[in-house]
Amino acid sequence: MAQPRIGQTVVVDVPATTANIGPGFDCLGAALDLNNRFTMRRIDGDGERFELIIEGQEGSHLRGGPDNLVYRAAQRVWKAAGQEPIAIEARVRLAVPPARGLGSSATAIVAGLVGANALVGEPLSREKLLELAIDIEGHPDNVVPSLLGGLCMTAKAASQRWRVVRCEWMHSIKAVVAIPAIRLSTSEARRAMPKSVPVGDAVVNLGALTLLLQGLRTGNGDLISDGMHDRLHEPYRWRLIKGGQEVKEAALSAGAWGCAISGAGPSILALCSEERGPAVSHAMVKAWEAAGVASRAPLLNLQTAGSHWQPKDAE
């Protein structure tokens, strides 16, 4: 196995993700064309040395050290590959804001896995990296599309093996993601949920998920509208998002087919046609403004490539 030289550098681009998309709780997620870029460099020192440099307005909220997800993921690669740990520096150009329900943690995990694997000659397969990513994150709906790209449905089979199905997303469907200047941790959002739900609610979600997937496959706005509803997590999480219900209603009134909490929130996802995108974006920002919350609402596309890396010299 190749031992990277001091100064050897790889650049890893990892997309944001929107998870759940209404009824697909903890199993459905999509990659979006908004990337964090991680530049990982072998530096002098032992395997416990890790340096983190953040570029971006929200970098002050992130910390280095042994609990950093990039570092933890890299350590898992060294262990799985039988590789002695190496000292690394990670420079992050932050475009995916943390604690907003856009998979920022997943980008760090995937970057640590892909970058560390690349630095030592890629001894681990994509399938092994996927397994490690899910194990670190604890659920698959962000890390899977972050690694693979596209719209992904992930489930653990009876064999206990993770199975991933790449689902279709009609290119005409656009995602408006309203990103507020407020934060919500995944742990807080999960604590708001009950330990169990009525069978009737689970049945409704199964039907809604079927409609949503068919709507995304065909570009049928009516199916997306009927399918983008949830009874498992959103009823308990909307109250955590200041002005969230008003933002949702504004998006629907402006022509969005459907609207949902992105991941654990507080960002809100609206699906619509390209024609209605600007109006939906404007309506969502204005609704949050009325609630006293600053926000932005970019119009995004599905990102199908997933994470990818290149040597620094090839930039």
From Swiss-Prot:
Subcellular location field: Cytoplasm
SUPFAM superfamilies according to UniProt: GHMP Kinase, C-terminal domain (SSF55060), Ribosomal protein S5 domain 2-like (SSF54211)
A GO MF term: ATP binding
InterPro entries recorded: GHMP_kinase_C_dom, GHMP_kinase_C_sf, GHMP_kinase_N_dom, GHMP_knse_ATP-bd_CS, Homoserine_kinase, Ribosomal_Su5_D2-typ_SF, Ribsml_uS5_D2-typ_fold_subgr
EC number(s) reported in the record: 2.7.1.39
Major localization class: cytoplasm
S-adenosyl-L-methionine in keyword set: no
Binding site residues for ATP: 97-107
Reactions catalysed, as given in the entry: L-homoserine + ATP = O-phospho-L-homoserine + ADP + H(+)
One GO term describing the cellular component: cytoplasm
Source superkingdom: Bacteria
Pfam families: GHMP_kinases_C, GHMP_kinases_N
Record function comment: Catalyzes the ATP-dependent phosphorylation of L-homoserine to L-homoserine phosphate.
Protein name from the UniProt record: Homoserine kinase
Organism the protein comes from: Synechococcus sp. (strain CC9311)
